[in-house]
Amino acid sequence: MRTPTGDLSDGPAEELGRDQPVFGPEIGEFEHSERRAAQADGEGEMKTGTTTVGIKTADGVVMATDMRASLGGMVSSKDVQKVEEVHPRGALTIAGSVSAAQNLISTLKAETSLYETRRGKDMSMEALSTLTGNLLRSGAFYIVQPILGGVDDEGSHIYSIDALGGTTEEEYTVTGSGSQYALGVLEQEYDDDVTVDEAKTMAAKAIQSAVERDLASGNGINVAVVTDDGVDITRYKDFDDLL
């Protein structure tokens, strides 16, 4: 999770005017020249990170994240929930700007509720992934990289969605600064017959691997299990509870 400090002059802020950066209020307004200087000076950049994981199984999906928020070299929070329910049978992990992620989650919740009210049924995961990609592509949430997971009439789904709205359905996926460590665990242990309980253990191992090597990840794990029965999110401070 992070707060934005990079140059926004080539994105939506350019269309609104240089004096009104889209995400400025979260950290204070920066003049254009100051943003340029911060970008040019490596020491001026705020390094941030997280680790999020999504795993598909035959009976549902498992999504897991660490619980640390960082800002530069500082741990800004030790108890952050980075996975949220956005659909009666769907959840979203978040990596990126805090404000943009919160706004994206609120928008998705509102859209899925409106869809259900108008049509009398839940939005499919394919439609929800398209909606999420379109919102990111619009530019308003372009510093967020989520994982979307859920269950619908077609089965279980995990979608990797990049910051520009590109959407790919995967068997498993990871995001964040610790992703290279987590991905190695999933590559080694995943198989098509994995159960929900096995996926929970696998996700915990993946997050733990990232926490041991990535300074921006840590402080426990949030695990979301999504099945036909709904979304269940549980916090664990100790990895041993899952291993």
From Swiss-Prot:
Keyword Phosphoprotein in the entry? The reply is: no
Q: What is its EC number?
A: 3.4.25.1
Q: Please give an example of a GO cellular component term from this record.
A: cytoplasm
Highest taxon, organism lineage:
Archaea
Give the record's free-text account of how this protein's activity is regulated.
Answer: The formation of the proteasomal ATPase PAN-20S proteasome complex, via the docking of the C-termini of PAN into the intersubunit pockets in the alpha-rings, triggers opening of the gate for substrate entry. Interconversion between the open-gate and close-gate conformations leads to a dynamic regulation of the 20S proteasome proteolysis activity.
Record's keyword terms, sorted? Autocatalytic cleavage, Cytoplasm, Hydrolase, Protease, Proteasome, Threonine protease, Zymogen
Q: Pfam families per the record?
A: Proteasome (PF00227)
The role this protein plays is: Component of the proteasome core, a large protease complex with broad specificity involved in protein degradation.
Q: Which NCBIfam families match?
A: arc_protsome_B
- What binding partners and quaternary form does the record give? The 20S proteasome core is composed of 14 alpha and 14 beta subunits that assemble into four stacked heptameric rings, resulting in a barrel-shaped structure. The two inner rings, each composed of seven catalytic beta subunits, are sandwiched by two outer rings, each composed of seven alpha subunits. The catalytic chamber with the active sites is on the inside of the barrel. Has a gated structure, the ends of the cylinder being occluded by the N-termini of the alpha-subunits. Is capped at one or both ends by the proteasome regulatory ATPase, PAN.
Q: What is this protein called?
A: Proteasome subunit beta
- Origin organism is Halorubrum lacusprofundi (strain ATCC 49239 / DSM 5036 / JCM 8891 / ACAM 34)
